[in-house]
Design a protein with these regions (language model features):
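A short, Lys/Arg-rich alpha-helix, primarily the initiator
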Residues: 1-17
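Short, Lys/Arg-enriched C-terminal cap helix and immediately downstream tail that follows
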Residues: 10, 44-45
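The alpha-helix within a helix-turn-helix
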Residues: 11, 22, 51
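Residue-level detection of the helix-turn-helix DNA-binding "recognition helix"
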Residues: 12, 26, 37-39, 63
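Residue at a beta-strand N-cap/secondary-structure junction
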Residues: 15, 41-44
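Short alpha-helical DNA-recognition segment
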Residues: 16-34
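DNA major-groove recognition helix of helix-turn-helix/homeodomain DNA-binding modules
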Residues: 45-60
Length: 63
């Protein structure tokens, strides 16, 4: 699963919109938007924030 699909999958599962996920992950909504639109590659630290916010391991997030 690519990053975009993972983000959308976990947003759906957790019933979060993009703004809610960004807040929960402690990141700017614009950064999350760029990642979702595949205009920016997330750093490992950003992946960790997203995975933590989605309550999964990074390996599950990028698998």
């Amino acid at each position: 699963m690519d990053i975009k699909k993972s983000i959308e999958h976990f947003m759906y599962e957790l019933r979060l919109n993009q703004n809610q996920l960004a807040i929960k992950a402690g990141m700017d909504i614009s950064t999350l938007s760029l990642i979702r639109n595949q205009l920016r590659s997330p750093s490992l630290a950003t992946l960790n924030k997203l995975a933590t916010a989605c309550e999964v391991k990074v390996s599950e997030f990028i698998a």
